[in-house]
């Protein structure tokens, strides 16, 4: 299946520098053994250390996949998913070691990685940068936030609505660089023709709800979606850096008739996005296997 990828990032309207980093590689640009590689890393730490952590992470992932091309190309299914988790563990060691330096102490980064091979997506994830799948017109969050508020919602301490404005909403419970032995979530799921995949930093979903993300995705031309999402986050205050990385699988999603792209636009790339309950979605997807 043909994979089209695109991405955009923005500092926002409050921060003076961008601590996000990303990878959006498809086709001949993708690392050996995969058809596309998508990564979003949202760095944290003072004195620009967050930028260092996110850049070390995305660069380390690409370098590791290139260095271990023979091993990764032979792996399939859960074995490839586990391999990607191992890659993040190795990158974590490098970031953790660098974070022991005085000027980088406390730095870290979220990391959400999606590798596509054939009709499967392999996800490795730590932190609260999200992965969303749009399938058959329905938007699903397929990653779980590693955050204080997510744990509180799971325990029934607060509601999902209260989590959006809770004082601890920016507190994450896992990240690259914080521990020598990070707990990384990995999963494998099948992809279908027409699927859309979105990875984003929390600068997007903390500013606009999933309903608005869905509306933008379904009412914008594909080549405009990344910028439209960032503009929407900035219009709501742009309190954080915002990064979106998008991939489409197979047939292009058509824009609404009123905004149909011209023939000259038909070679541009496209995108994916968001939704609520990750557990329900993963179970539903796995039942199709």
Question: Predicted segments — roles?
Answer:
Residues 1-289:
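PP2C/PPM-type serine/threonine phosphatase catalytic domain
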């Amino acid at each position: 299946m043909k994979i089209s990828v695109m991405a955009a990032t923005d500092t926002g309207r409050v921060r003076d520098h961008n601590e996000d980093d990303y990878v959006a590689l498809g086709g001949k640009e993708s690392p050996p053994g995969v058809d596309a590689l998508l990564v979003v890393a949202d760095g944290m730490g003072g004195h620009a250390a967050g930028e260092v952590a996110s850049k070390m992470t995305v660069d380390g992932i690409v370098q590791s996949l290139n260095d271990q091309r023979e091993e990764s190309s032979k792996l399939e299914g859960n074995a490839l998913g586990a391999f990607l988790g191992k890659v993040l563990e190795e990158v974590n060691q490098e970031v953790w070691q660098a974070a022991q330096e005085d000027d980088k102490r406390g730095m870290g980064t979220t990391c959400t990685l999606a590798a596509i091979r054939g009709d499967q997506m392999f996800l490795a994830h730590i932190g609260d940068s999200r992965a969303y799948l749009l399938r058959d017109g329905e938007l699903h969050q397929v990653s779980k936030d590693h955050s204080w508020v997510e744990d509180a919602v799971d325990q029934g301490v607060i509601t999902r609505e209260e989590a959006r404005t809770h004082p601890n909403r920016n507190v994450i419970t896992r990240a690259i660089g914080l521990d020598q032995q990070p707990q990384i979530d990995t999963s494998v799921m099948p992809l279908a023709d027409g699927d859309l995949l979105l990875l984003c930093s929390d600068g997007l979903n903390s500013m606009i709800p999933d309903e608005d993300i869905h509306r933008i995705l379904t009412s914008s031309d594909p080549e405009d979606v990344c910028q439209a999402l960032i503009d929407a986050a900035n219009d709501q205050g742009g309190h954080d850096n915002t990064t979106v990385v998008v991939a489409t699988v197979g047939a292009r999603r058509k824009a609404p008739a009123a905004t149909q792209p011209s023939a000259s636009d038909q070679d541009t790339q496209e995108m994916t996005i968001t939704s609520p309950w990750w557990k329900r979605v993963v179970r539903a997807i796995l039942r199709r296997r």
